[in-house]
């Protein structure tokens, strides 16, 4: 059988008609795949919208026995957002009686226990969870009010007494509250002026003996409270003075005895 061969057949180059046919078949396959993917996406979107519509609560006026397919497919994003908003919990509206009882309970205790909350919830016909949430919100409001009142109070004080902070700090915490401690202490013999006749410490005589004749030179007011030393220091100080005074008395007694014996000897 004689068969003619073209140069394209010998070289293995495909025919132009076959190339066009292959390209057409490939394009049709790709288009079919794209259509299938879009159809799947549309089905998933429709199913999702149907689920959202089923989950959304309906109003009594909008309740119907069935939903048409056109309504299901034509649901817009605004409707979906409305459904999401409807999922949120509605705010609890309290009656005047309920608010009155809640405020009375809050005045008694800001942190009521579970039993008190349950009793109050039964009294005002509310769930215990709602009562607990009300107390949490009321405590937060109370804290905010306390902070605002404290800030206003301090602001008013600063307006009325602008230098009250400085004067209080300077009077309560002076730079040198006891300037006489830096000076040299007197001798032990002069400490007898510190005591009354009953043996108690006299702070005024102590300050005067140390050289402060007037408190106005120190810019200090006379003490309104009796000055006292710490218990241990007072005992040590009094013991020291008593030993010094007793030794002084012994020395004076020995001197007088020696003088008397000498006088007696001279007279004899």
Curated annotation (Swiss-Prot):
Subcellular localization: Nucleus
Keyword annotations: Developmental protein, DNA-binding, Homeobox, Nucleus, Transcription, Transcription regulation
Protein origin, superkingdom: Eukaryota
Pfam families: Homeodomain
One cellular component term from this protein's GO annotations in UniProt: nucleus
An example molecular function term from Gene Ontology annotations: DNA-binding transcription factor activity, RNA polymerase II-specific
GO terms (BP aspect): positive regulation of transcription by RNA polymerase II
Keyword Transferase on entry: no
DNA-binding span(s): 87-146
Disordered as annotated region, ranges: 56-87
Keyword Nucleus in annotation: yes
Alphabetized InterPro entries for the sequence: HD (IPR001356), Homeobox_CS (IPR017970), Homeodomain-like_sf (IPR009057), RAX/RAX2 (IPR043562)
PANTHER family linked: HOMEOBOX PROTEIN, PUTATIVE-RELATED (PTHR46271:SF4)
Stated family: Belongs to the paired homeobox family. Bicoid subfamily.
UniProt name for this protein: Retinal homeobox protein Rax
Organism: Dugesia japonica
């Amino acid at each position: 059988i004689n068969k003619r061969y073209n140069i394209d057949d010998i070289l293995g180059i495909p025919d132009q008609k076959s190339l066009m046919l292959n390209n057409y078949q490939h394009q049709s396959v790709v288009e079919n795949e794209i259509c299938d993917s879009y159809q799947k996406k549309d089905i998933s979107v429709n199913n999702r919208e149907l689920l959202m519509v089923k989950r959304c609560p309906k109003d009594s006026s909008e309740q119907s026995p069935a939903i048409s397919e056109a309504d299901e497919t034509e649901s817009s994003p605004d409707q979906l957002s409305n459904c999401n908003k409807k999922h949120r919990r509605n705010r609890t509206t309290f009656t005047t009686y309920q608010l009155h009882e809640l405020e009375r309970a809050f005045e008694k205790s800001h942190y009521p226990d579970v039993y008190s909350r349950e009793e109050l919830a039964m009294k005002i016909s509310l769930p215990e969870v709602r009562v607990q949430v009300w107390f949490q919100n009321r405590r937060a409001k109370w804290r905010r009010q306390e902070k605002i009142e404290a800030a206003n109070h301090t602001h008013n004080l600063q307006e009325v007494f602008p230098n009250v902070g400085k004067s209080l700090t300077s009077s309560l915490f002076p730079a040198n509250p006891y300037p006489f401690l830096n000076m040299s202490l007197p001798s032990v013999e002069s400490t007898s002026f510190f005591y009354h006749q009953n043996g108690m410490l006299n702070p005024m005589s102590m300050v005067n003996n140390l050289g402060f004749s007037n408190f106005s030179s120190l810019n200090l007011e006379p003490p309104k409270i009796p000055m006292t030393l710490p218990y241990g220091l007072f005992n040590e100080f009094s013991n020291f003075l008593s030993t010094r005074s007793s030794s002084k008395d012994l020395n004076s007694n020995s001197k007088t005895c020696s003088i008397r014996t000498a006088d007696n000897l001279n007279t004899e």
